[in-house]
Amino acid sequence: MSLITDIIAREVLDSRGNPTLEAEVITELGGFGRGMVPSGASTGEHEAVELRDGDKSRFGGKGTTKAVANVNDVIAKALVGKFDVTDQRAIDQAMIELDGTENKGKLGANAILAVSIAAARAAADELGVPLFSYLGGANSYVLPTPMMNVINGGAHSANKVDFQEFMIMPVGAPTVKEAIRYGAETFHALKKLLEADGKATSVGDEGGFAPDFADNEEPLKYLIRAIEAAGYKPGKDIAIAVDVASSELYDAATKTYKLRWSTGDEFTTPEFIKYLEDLADRYPIISIEDPIDENEWEDWAEITSELGKKVQLVGDDFFVTNTQYLQKGINMGAANSILIKVNQIGTLTETFEAIEMAKEAGYTAIVSHRSGETEDTTISDLVVATNAGQIKTGSLSRTDRIAKYNQLIRIEELLDTTAQYKGIHSFYNLSAAAREAIQAK
């Protein structure tokens, strides 16, 4: 047993230059851990509360000094000298009870999560084991198939593309190191194609390109060209994933989806489902995130009934990494995958519970970054610890994204011959026939 002897928090900056929270945990045997918290641009209505100061004279109101004070003055007093650093569940539960709200609005999910991560890292440090091994034990061996966001749109950019993310997934790679190479080579091939066509190659929040396109289909055509230019086969070697972020397009009053940034076209829900199905039929699209507004549960069940056997349908804003919402979705047959964002729920313990619930229901779980990131690589360890099988951590540029990929390379090297990269088989929520059909496109 090793008690926590000190907890320290401070305000630092994220990848967008906005303030965020960093916490450090120190133990009586010299264990040390640090946790940094990301933040999102496109956030779900039901996410745990990210506590900000609201003082417009400082960081435009986005300061985190209140959350820092909650760690230093409230959480530290409750945990220091009272908890064994290796008792993650007890530490997280104590902070949840200390907050006492449904959405962690009193202390802030950012304050709680920073300490949750730092405690896990301190425990791993004290025991002399990698974080993934500490969190997952001897059964942690699956390296994830990456979702690489190489074209940004929607709330993540200033262009005329409605969909928020266009991603490549190296489903045919033999290892995660090779998957990262496939992605990097395709990223650079895409840049050359854009430059040759006179399009901008500046990057968005997550490191992907954000040039203007005529509509939402043009980026898909560029991805196919880039995959081929890099020497790979679309579908077989590299599949495509998209994040529609449809809550940004939905008008609840008229119950329609409007392509507000591109063509201005409006769709009823059945028409929008058909629109997405048509794209999935014509391109090797293996995953669609948030295809339906986060509050339209019956419509989610409808799209899952129509498309869920042939494409992964991911709930992000829909589930917000919350087991209550996930269980409701499972009961209704809504979605077949959940996006896991640790700061949507606020503790590692609750994150593990969401991943386990998803797996038991046959849903995939995709461990994800946020658009406002830091150099913290916890999600790389988390995805291996849970054998989740898929990770979404941005493009092949910007150090805040690359840090996660580099950590996966290190983990694969540590695991050596026990490491498994599932690739196309990480989509266990799809039938073998559906996986084969995507790879044949």
Curated annotation (Swiss-Prot):
Q: Which residues form the active site?
A: E206, K341
- Residues reported to bind Mg(2+): D243, E289, D316
Q: What is its EC number?
A: 4.2.1.11
* Single GO MF descriptor: phosphopyruvate hydratase activity
- Biological process according to GO: glycolytic process
* CDD domains found in the cross-reference section: enolase (cd03313)
Q: Where does (2R)-2-phosphoglycerate bind?
A: Q164, K341, R370, S371, K392
What the entry lists under PANTHER family is as follows: ENOLASE (PTHR11902:SF1)
Protein name according to UniProt: Enolase
Gene encoding it?
Answer: eno
